[in-house]
């Protein structure tokens, strides 16, 4: 009797199981497609918004609008608003859980994140300075976006716009959505790190920082994959940007400002390199959490949706490169 019941219901069980697998696969592909679309939205929307705001500002404030304090703050705020919009669209369309993106992790990933960021900020940036010098030897002029005023009470909104908001919204887009969907779709760890790092670097559109941003993107993605959470990378991102803002506000590295003594600078670079090496040894060799071998499963869905954003970022990168050599 039990055998007849089992044989009679076994086909139904197989059918239901197959349908559940198909639904899960459809959800993963849809979420991966929406992640690619989020990258495109995050790349295109700031360009369109900045052109519109620049046009309106030029009409209202005249030619000198770009040097005004309010416009410099707005130039840093606008991309974060666009990233937030891209994330909202993603969560609404993909049905991915917001809580899943911001879930917690083991406590020790936070000190690892800070050590990693300390290593990236000083030792790796020193290597990036050498790369910039190499480009400048061929006549390249490195163009940087000027910071808003940092004196007095300006420091508080600067920390909010330059440190807090990017730590939330950039990490949500690049690590929470992109890295999260790549991992959830069965991409191999190496593929996830390299592709997300390349997209992160290309997105910033600065040829002089291409290698630096790529390595940072790979390291942040590795941290997120191991931790299973973007919270440690958010903490590292905030620490990096906040320290830059605070140091710059004191005059460090600015024209006419103070310069760190050479002995201090050497000690800082060496200690930073040690921290970077130690954190990478832990994340690469001692911690194997969420490690996965494999390629780019269903990658065509992601890249098709991300193609517009990749094209826009590539054009910006090329324009900046040409401008740097012709300026």
Model-identified regions with their sequence ranges:
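Alpha-helical transmembrane segments of MFS and MFS-like solute carriers/permeases
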Residues: 37-41, 112-116, 161-162, 196-199
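Hydrophobic alpha-helical membrane-insertion segments
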Residues: 43-48, 111-125, 225, 235
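Short helix-terminus and kink motifs of transmembrane alpha helices
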Residues: 50, 54, 125-129, 175-176, ...
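Juxtamembrane helix-loop-helix connectors linking adjacent transmembrane helices
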Residues: 61, 65-71, 97-166, 180, ...
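Cytoplasmic juxtamembrane interface segments
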Residues: 85-105, 198-215
């Amino acid at each position: 009797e039990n055998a007849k019941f089992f044989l009679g219901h076994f086909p139904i069980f197989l059918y239901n199981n197959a349908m559940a697998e198909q639904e899960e696969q459809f959800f993963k592909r849809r979420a991966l497609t929406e992640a690619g679309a989020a990258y495109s939205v995050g790349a295109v929307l700031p360009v369109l918004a900045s052109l519109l705001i620049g046009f309106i500002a030029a009409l209202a404030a005249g030619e000198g609008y770009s040097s005004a304090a309010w416009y410099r703050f707005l130039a840093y705020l606008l991309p974060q608003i666009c990233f937030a919009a891209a994330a909202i669209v993603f969560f609404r369309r993909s049905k991915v859980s917001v809580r899943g993106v911001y879930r917690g992790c083991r406590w020790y990933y936070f000190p690892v994140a800070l050590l990693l960021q300390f290593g990236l900020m000083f030792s790796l940036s020193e290597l990036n300075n050498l790369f910039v010098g190499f480009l400048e030897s061929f006549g390249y002029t490195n163009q940087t976006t000027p910071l808003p005023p940092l004196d007095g009470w300006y420091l508080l909104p600067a920390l909010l716009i330059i440190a807090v908001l990017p730590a939330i919204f950039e990490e949500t887009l690049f690590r929470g959505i992109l890295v999260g969907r790549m991992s959830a779709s069965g991409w191999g760890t190496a593929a996830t790190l390299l592709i997300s790092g390349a997209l992160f670097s290309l997105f910033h559109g600065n040829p002089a920082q291409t290698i630096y941003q790529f390595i940072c993107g790979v390291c942040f993605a590795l941290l997120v994959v191991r931790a299973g959470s973007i919270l440690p990378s958010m903490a590292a991102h905030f620490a990096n940007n906040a320290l830059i803002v605070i140091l710059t506000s004191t005059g460090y590295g600015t024209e006419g400002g103070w310069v760190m003594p050479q002995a201090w600078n050497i000690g800082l670079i060496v200690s930073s390199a040690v921290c970077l090496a130690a954190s990478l040894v832990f994340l690469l060799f001692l911690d194997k959490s969420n490690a996965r071998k494999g390629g780019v499963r269903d990658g065509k869905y992601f890249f098709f949706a991300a193609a517009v954003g990749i094209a826009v970022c590539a054009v910006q990168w090329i324009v900046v490169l040409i401008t740097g050599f012709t300026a």
